[in-house]
């Protein structure tokens, strides 16, 4: 590994260059070099977040203000935990803001996640038959915010990956419709590809405001974007059984 000093406009930057080790693919070397030089990765290490993804939800909340002290948050696909960390801070789950109400944060992921102070974490396959009932039991009431950063393992085929993540978003949205308080917020990561249009239409029927955002922390070469649906209309907006 080597470093190179570059300067511009009076500032010096230190860029890390990674040599391709024996047995390591060039693509792996380039990924590692990008990680080591990514300002969000560097910032996350300094500020104690578990990954650069924390800044995506920070930037979304800075823009829309859905994480409030006293709020009840469910984070689906929470590994490695950056979104939960942000939620804990913003809803005052640790009670560090003495003059503000304390919120709660519940995280769920297929993978095991290291404990996060102020959050309740469970390992669970959210697509299993009884998953939503389990999560509702752990939640013990309604939620103000449901966030989903769920993603299926990459297949290498963009169309397939797009359809898989849309299916996860639809499952998360169905759960949100069931647990959100009226006026609540749903936030989810999607991959652009066309199939998200039906999801958008569904959300617009159930929320007063739906926005598609690519926050600065989302890499420019990524097809990911985030849907932020605010102002949940409530379960009364759903058709009654037998209604056409």
Swiss-Prot record:
The keyword Transferase is assigned to this record: yes
Primary enzyme class: transferase
Catalytic residues (positions): 189 (proton acceptor)
Catalytic activity of the protein: uridine(2552) in 23S rRNA + S-adenosyl-L-methionine = 2'-O-methyluridine(2552) in 23S rRNA + S-adenosyl-L-homocysteine + H(+)
Keywords: Cytoplasm, Methyltransferase, rRNA processing, S-adenosyl-L-methionine, Transferase
GO cellular component: cytoplasm
Family, as annotated: Belongs to the class I-like SAM-binding methyltransferase superfamily. RNA methyltransferase RlmE family.
UniProt superkingdom: Bacteria
GO MF terms held by the record: rRNA (uridine-2'-O-)-methyltransferase activity
InterPro entries (UniProt xref): RNA_methyltr_RlmE (IPR050082), RNA_MeTrfase_FtsJ_dom (IPR002877), rRNA-MeTfrase_E (IPR015507), SAM-dependent_MTases_sf (IPR029063)
Organism phylogeny: Bacteria, Pseudomonadati, Pseudomonadota, Alphaproteobacteria, Rhodobacterales
Binding site for S-adenosyl-L-methionine: 81, 83, 109, 125, 149
Designated name of the protein: Ribosomal RNA large subunit methyltransferase E
Pfam assignment, any one: FtsJ
Annotated PANTHER family: RIBOSOMAL RNA METHYLTRANSFERASE, RRNA METHYLTRANSFERASE 2, MITOCHONDRIAL
Record function comment: Specifically methylates the uridine in position 2552 of 23S rRNA at the 2'-O position of the ribose in the fully assembled 50S ribosomal subunit.
Species the sequence originates in: Cereibacter sphaeroides (strain ATCC 17023 / DSM 158 / JCM 6121 / CCUG 31486 / LMG 2827 / NBRC 12203 / NCIMB 8253 / ATH 2.4.1.) (Rhodobacter sphaeroides)
Enzyme Commission identifier(s): 2.1.1.166
Subcellular location(s) of the protein: Cytoplasm
